[in-house]
Curated annotation (Swiss-Prot):
Keywords: Acyltransferase, Amino-acid biosynthesis, Cysteine biosynthesis, Cytoplasm, Repeat, Transferase. GO terms for biological process: cysteine biosynthetic process from serine. It is found in: Cytoplasm. The gene is cysE. This is Serine acetyltransferase. InterPro entries: Hexapep, Hexapep_transf_CS, LbH_SAT, Ser_AcTrfase_N, Ser_AcTrfase_N_sf, Ser_O-AcTrfase, Serine_acetyltransferase, Trimer_LpxA-like_sf.
Amino acid sequence: MTLDVWQHIRQEAKELAENEPMLASFFHSTILKHQNLGGALSYLLANKLANPIMPAISLREIIEEAYQSNPSIIDCAACDIQAVRHRDPAVELWSTPLLYLKGFHAIQSYRITHYLWNQNRKSLALYLQNQISVAFDVDIHPAAKIGHGIMFDHATGIVVGETSVIENDVSILQGVTLGGTGKESGDRHPKVREGVMIGAGAKILGNIEVGKYAKIGANSVVLNPVPEYATAAGVPARIVSQDKAAKPAFDMNQYFIGIDDGMNLNI
């Protein structure tokens, strides 16, 4: 799939450069001069995260080291591009996430910090975590575990804590927090299972599970586990519906039934 995604991106870049000569050099430097998705991605991320202390050339060496040691990182990036292309109606081109979407950039940058964290290069991982937060306004701890097929839509203000888990095929909108409940240590953050959609501004706090294909309504505060296929909404959140045919991360349907008809999560 990675090669197919890259071929789509290159073809689009050629057409875009022809149609908008003012951006021809931009499309050349970001896509057309590179041989593969990894090359383009390392160039883009290095330039977005660079500063006077850590120039782009040094960052690119770090990123390419991660790709060479763990090529699956690039495969995950291709899955993420496909997820955004298929789920976001505003995204008409395969190249859009790679070029313009900071949610995608933040996730791919996190994957480098996660590699470094697992290599026990924790100081560098934390340094880059801060740079990601500054550049993209997304704060993902390097130790968090995130799968593939992930979409951070708009992404501004997303926070993912140290012991959080986000499984494959999850969609998360802006302003979401996967956080702890206080000063406790150890395993203290949410576990988000596959196919979940989390609406804008939702807060999920503590070591609780959000079951597969669940939906969290916008601005909800979730303090208790959410069953599979359930929709939870409100402050504090309650179960308002359950549909075993739903695929919320793919459908991206923000609607849910009235919360007055819901039941308390403690039931």
